[in-house]
């Protein structure tokens, strides 16, 4: 747990952000989620999830590209390695399991969905994949420090031959 203090207009705001630093410096950050309210009768009408604020200091590589990808039920994106790019992922709709293979060959499984939002940082040269473990199309928000260009050959497809992806399929 880290506390960040911000002083602005005589206001001191302390926010505790839970950051799990994993092997090879990939990180899992539990994101803030706040209910939103109707302006007239104040009933709850949804929620707001904070993915990133410049003063949080949770993103160490400035994003140059932000995109949303979809993953159909039971389908897998990856596994692959980005040789230059650092990526930050958050499941914004549906259910996704992020599988990260550290440099010692150990697999780490991070479940993410919009009810319990997380931001997963996968640094360059670390293998990862994500699979939709739910019954509806999932959407993943990605922040990347290098913008994608056609034919840049920055991504290497690999296989997780010693990992059972089928356990997440329904």
Across the structure, where does each feature detected by a protein language model lie?
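N-terminal amphipathic/basic-hydrophobic helices that include classical n-h-c signal peptides
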Residues: 1-21
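Non-catalytic, conserved peripheral segments adjacent to functional cores
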Residues: 14-119, 135-170
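Glycine-centered loop/turn positions within well-structured domains
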Residues: 128
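Asparagine-centered strand-capping/turn motif at beta-strand->loop junctions
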Residues: 131-132
